[in-house]
Amino acid sequence: MPRARKGNTPRKGGQRRGGGARSSAQADSGSSEDEAASEARSTTSECPSLLSTTAEDSLGGDTVDEQGPQEDLEEKLKEYVDGLTDKSAKTRQGALESLRLALASRLLPDFLLERRFTLADALEKCLKKGKGEEQALAAAVLGLLCVQLGPGPKGEELFHSLQPLLLSVLSDSTASPAARLHCASALGLGCYVAAADVQDLVSCLACLEGVFSRSCGTGSSTSHVAPASLHGVCCAALQAWALLLTICPSAHISHILDRQLPRLPQLLSSESVNLRIAAGETIALLFELARDLEEDFVYEDMEALCSTLRTLATDSNKYRAKADRRRQRSTFRAVLHYVEGGECEEETVRFGLEVLYVDSWARHRVYTSFKEALGSGLHHHLQNNELLRDIFGLGPVLVLDATALKACKISRFEKHLYNAAAFKARTKARSRVRDKRADIL
């Protein structure tokens, strides 16, 4: 796997801290503004999400009981794998969905290694002969398989065998938007985790760039308005492309900057709030990569870009949904802050007894990609998946017995005191910038 520029100088504001894990006796609490900003930094697609179902949903209404015997779990997983080759499209979709939920919420490397050829053949048929939702689910399962198998020879072999199909569906303008969207995401995630060599990376980058350039008109001199049905495809291709930029060799980065940095601002005027946000975050990432290559990097059209970013950061149009306005303003304030001043806001992610710091745009793109793929299972994978712990610099998996866990756990009363103190400090900080009626009078 062409892992992300590890031999280079650490990224400013990004990997110098590595994301390291540390014990935390504090409760996972924070201000509502921080939560809103964190929510705003996570862009979702406009097609129906495959992560909308809870992790308890399963084939035939059964549940994957995390506390149940391992034998029962494997029996259910075998049923799901067998269901992938059923004659009924509805049964195949149910099996794919159940398998996807299991892969997102559990670590199953041994089970998957034994059946990787069976799974590869079944997913190939689903991508070739399936339609719409079935292709979308198959692509999502493939991405999760790469996360489970990791960057070794087995994962590389799986991705390399199905990469041409992902490229084919993604480039097919007659395929359903949902299928193309999830093929784009799977292509980005699979290539990030299991690309065999740099040539695979370059070919995936070229395909993804071609999709969002053709769909949204960023590669043409004339303005081109993409239909609403393609906004999700465009957004997913752009985000997958940005993910792969974080592991792209410096020699290729400079050419990409020259080609795409002047074009991407066109997407800031899109009708889709998700596409605008994805474009803004990608622009910030390109600035970060450019400043890594050249410390005194100067963008020629800086004034016009900052003006557009400032407008989006203060947008108050009433015809937009309130949640969309809040998400857009929060994101573009952070983008503008980085483009103008070079400082990236830090996001703190607590899981179990550990803490992950997301303090660069490259790190944010990687974290968001895994978050969208794994959904509610992200924290489980951060704690136990060696691949994710290596990517985010979390070190070996923590092994804690029941006594250690009990010693680290704080009581409900202590948690209440901590939250009360945080609330009081937050109120004082906010009161300084609020209008006072007495001052106005």
Curated annotation (Swiss-Prot):
> GO MF annotations for this entry?
ribosome binding; translation repressor activity
Q: Name one Pfam family in it.
A: IFRD_C
Composition-biased stretches (Acidic residues): 63-72
Alphabetical list of InterPro entries matching this protein = ARM-like (IPR011989), ARM-type_fold (IPR016024), IFRD (IPR039777), Interferon-rel_develop_reg_C (IPR006921), Interferon-rel_develop_reg_N (IPR007701)
Q: Which domain of life is it from?
A: Eukaryota
Could you tell me which residues belong to the region Disordered?
Answer: 1-72
Keyword set for this entry? Answer: Translation regulation
GO biological process terms, semicolon-separated: negative regulation of translation
Q: In what ranges is there compositional bias, type Basic residues?
A: 1-15
- Provide the assembly information: Associates with ribosomes; promoting ribosome inactivation.
**Family the UniProt entry places it in:** Belongs to the IFRD family.
Q: What PANTHER family does this protein's entry cite?
A: INTERFERON-RELATED DEVELOPMENTAL REGULATOR, INTERFERON-RELATED DEVELOPMENTAL REGULATOR 2
Give the function comment from the record.
Ribosome-binding protein that acts as an inhibitor of mRNA translation by promoting ribosome inactivation. Associates with the P- and E-sites of the ribosome and inserts a C-terminal helix into the mRNA exit channel to preclude translation.
Q: What is this protein called?
A: Interferon-related developmental regulator 2
